[in-house]
Amino acid sequence: AQSLSFSFTKFDPNQEDLIFQGTATSKLDSAGNPVSSSAGRVLYSAPLRLWEDSAVLTSFDPTIYIFTNYTSRIADGLAFIAPPDSVISYHGGFLGLFPNAAESGIAESNVVAVEFDTDYLNPDYGDPNYIHIGIDVNSIRSKVTASWDWQNGKIATAHISYNSVSKRLSVTTYYPGRGKPATSYDIELHTVLPEWVRVGLSASTGQNIERNTVHSWSFTSSLWTNVAKVGVASISG
C-alpha cells in the first residue's frame, strides 16, 4: 500500500513540501492589494499516484478552509486542482488552469478541477448567472454547477470527495449556520489524468481583484492492489 497524507495550517514559500508558482506568494501592490491580471498556484511537492495498470479506483476527501475578500468588484475565484504538470496557465476567468482561447484557439487542458467561482459574469465560459461551485474536466466550461451562498469576508469550509466504486466526484461548501450547496459528476480519472499527478490550489485575477486566503488544507490518500491486481487509491484532502 502507498499513501499520501498532509495537513497545512500555514503556507510559507520556504516550506519544502509546497511548490509556489506565479503570484501565490501574496504578490501585493504598494497599497497592500493583490495584483490584477495575475495567477498563482500552490502544489504539494510529492506526486500522487491515481491509478495502477490502467485501473482507477480512487477515493478522496479534500477539506479546505477558504477566506475570500474583495473591496470593489468580485474577481475570479479559486480552484482545487489535480493537474498532470506544473505549468501555470492564463489568468482571469481561466483560473491559471487553461489557455486563453482568444490567443491560442483552445480553452482546454488535461486537468480536473473543482472551482469556487465568485465571478459569474463570464457567459463565454458557460457560467451560470450566479456565484457557484463547479466541476471542470479538461475545460473551463464546468460539467456541473451549483449555486454557492458565498459570504464576502467570511471563512468557508469546502469538502471534496471522489468515490472509487461509484466513480463520483463531489463537492460541498458551506458557512457555519447556513446551507450546504453541493454538486457531483461521474468520471473515471484514468481517462483524463496520467498515473501520477500533483494536487494543489490555483487562483487568478483579471481586471478586478480579490484576495483568496486558504486558512488550512488537509489531504490523505492510499493506494491498494486487490487480488485481481486492480489499483485502488483513496484520497482525502
From Swiss-Prot:
Q: Which residues carry this modification: Blocked amino end (Ile)?
A: 106
Sequence positions that bind Ca(2+): 117, 120, 122, 127
Alphabetical list of Pfam families matching this protein: Lectin_legB
Binding sites annotated in the UniProt record for Mn(2+): 115, 117, 127, 132
Residue positions with a glycan: 69
Question: Which SUPFAM superfamilies does this entry report, sorted A to Z?
Answer: Concanavalin A-like lectins/glucanases
Its biological purpose is as follows: D-mannose/D-glucose-binding lectin. Requires Ca(2+) and Mn(2+) ions for full activity.
Q: How does it assemble?
A: Tetramer of two alpha and two beta chains.
Q: What is this protein called?
A: Lectin
Source taxonomy lineage?
A: Eukaryota, Viridiplantae, Streptophyta, Embryophyta, Tracheophyta
